[in-house]
C-alpha cells in the first residue's frame, strides 16, 4: 500500500507540473539538440520507503537499526525472506548521464552506491575483576563491527516524444549488489575456568545462533565472524515510462515508473564462525557453521516496481 501511495503521489505531482507548463500561453520551447549531454540526480522513494540499503542484507544490520522491545529483542533482527528483491530496485539516490544521439533517442546511464563501517560498542562486566572482587565495578567493552556496501549501475536507451512536456520511456540493463560481513570483538576471553564469559546482551539475544548450529563438542559458543549473505549480485532488465518537463532552458525535472521484470541474483557462501571451549581437547577452538555453499535466484514479475524522480541539466 505504501508503494502505491508513493507512486501515485509522484506521478500526480509530475502531471500537475506538466499541465501548468502547457497552459502557459507564452511558454518558450526548450528541447535538447542532437549531440548534447545531460547530467542529473535521481531519487527512488520506493527504495527509501522499503529501507532498501545494503545494511538490510545483514541480520546485524537489522539489529543495529531496529527497534528494541520490552524484552530486549530487536524488531527486524531476523533475516527477511524477500530481501533479495532489494536488488531489483534502482538505488535510492543515483547520478545519471544522458547523450542525445537522435532527436527522439538518447543513451542513458546511472550509478548509485552506499556503504559504511559501523563499530558498535557496549560495556560489560569484567569477569576477571569480578572473580577477584565480587564488588568490583570494572568493565570491558564488546564490539560489533559491521562492514557493508551496496549500489547499482544501469545502462540503456531512452525515447521521447513532445516538447516542453515530454513523454519518455526506455529500457536497458541493470547491475546491482549489496551486503557485507560482520566481525565481533570481546572484552572477556573464553578460558577453561570461564567457558561462558559475560557478553553483550544484545549479541546473545539477537545475533548468537550457536544453539541451532549443530556443534556437539562445545557447550557454548559465540560468533567471531558472520558472513551472513555476503555481497550478493544481480543482473536484470529494466523498463520505464514517465514524463519530463523543461521548466527552464537546459533544465528539466521528471518522474518515471521503473519496472524490473526479470533479474538473476547470486548469493555467495554463507557461514558463521563461533569460538568456544572444546570440552574434548581442553582448549579454546573455533567452529565454522557453514549455512550455504551459495544460491541462485530468478526474480521475475510486475511487482518489482519503483519510481525515479529526477533533475537534469543539459549542455
Residue map of PLM features:
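Cleavable N-terminal export/targeting peptides
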Residues: 1-36
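Short glycine/proline- and aromatic-enriched beta-strand/turn motifs that initiate or cap beta-hairpins
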Residues: 22-110, 114, 120, 299-315
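Outer-membrane beta-barrel domain signature
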Residues: 28, 82-86, 142-146, 160, ...
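Outer-membrane beta-barrel proteins
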Residues: 48-54, 117-122, 178-184, 264-273
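Charged, glycine/proline-rich intrinsically disordered loops and linkers
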Residues: 64-74, 197-218, 278-287
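Extracytoplasmic loops and strand-loop junctions of Gram-negative outer membrane beta-barrel proteins
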Residues: 72-81, 134-141, 216-227, 288-295
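Gram-negative (and chloroplast) outer-membrane scaffold detector with strong preference
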Residues: 93-222, 230, 234-237, 245-251, ...
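Predominantly the C-terminal beta-signal and adjacent terminal strand-loop region
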Residues: 242-315
Amino acid at each position: 500500500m505504501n508503494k502505491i501511495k508513493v507512486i501515485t503521489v509522484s506521478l500526480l505531482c509530475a502531471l500537475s507540473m506538466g499541465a501548468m507548463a502547457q497552459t502557459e500561453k507564452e511558454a518558450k520551447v526548450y528541447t535538447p539538440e542532437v549531440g548534447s549531454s545531460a547530467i542529473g540526480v535521481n531519487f527512488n522513494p520506493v527504495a527509501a520507503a522499503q529501507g532498501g540499503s545494503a545494511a538490510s542484507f545483514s541480520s546485524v544490520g537489522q539489529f543495529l537499526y531496529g527497534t528494541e522491545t520490552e524484552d530486549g529483542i530487536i524488531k527486524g533482527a531476523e533475516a527477511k525472506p524477500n530481501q533479495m528483491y532489494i536488488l531489483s530496485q534502482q538505488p535510492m539516490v543515483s547520478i545519471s548521464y544522458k547523450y542525445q544521439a537522435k532527436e527522439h533517442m538518447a543513451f542513458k546511464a546511472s550509478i548509485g552506491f552506499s556503504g559504511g563501517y559501523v563499530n558498535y560498542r557496549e560495556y560489560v562486566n569484567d569477569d576477571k575483576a569480578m572473580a577477584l572482587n565480587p564488588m568490583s565495578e570494572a568493565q570491558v567493552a564488546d564490539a560489533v563491527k559491521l562492514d557493508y556496501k551496496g549500489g547499482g549501475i544501469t545502462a540503456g536507451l531512452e525515447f521521447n516524444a513532445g516538447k516542453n512536456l515530454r513523454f519518455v520511456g526506455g529500457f536497458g540493463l541493470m547491475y546491482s549488489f549489496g551486503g557485507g560481513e560482520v566481525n565481533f570483538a570481546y572484552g572477556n576471553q573464553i578460558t577453561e575456568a570461564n567457558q561462558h564469559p559475560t557478553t553483550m546482551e544484545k549479541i546473545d539475544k539477537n545475533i548468537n545462533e550457536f544453539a541451532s548450529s549443530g556443534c556437539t563438542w562445545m557447550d557454548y559458543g559465540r560468533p567471531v565472524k558472520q558472513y551472513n549473505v555476503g555481497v550478493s549480485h544481480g543482473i536484470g532488465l529494466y523498463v520505464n515510462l514517465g514524463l519530463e518537463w523543461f521548466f527552464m532552458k537546459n533544465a528539466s525535472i521528471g518522474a518515471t515508473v521503473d519496472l524490473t521484470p526479470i533479474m538473476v541474483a547470486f548469493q555467495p557462501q554463507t557461514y558463521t564462525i563461533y569460538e568456544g571451549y572444546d570440552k574434548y581437547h581442553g582448549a579454546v577452538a573455533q567452529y565454522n557453521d557453514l549455512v550455504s555453499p551459495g544460491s541462485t535466484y530468478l526474480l521475475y514479475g510486475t511487482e518489482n516496481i519503483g519510481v525515479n524522480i529526477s533533475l537534469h541539466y543539459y549542455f
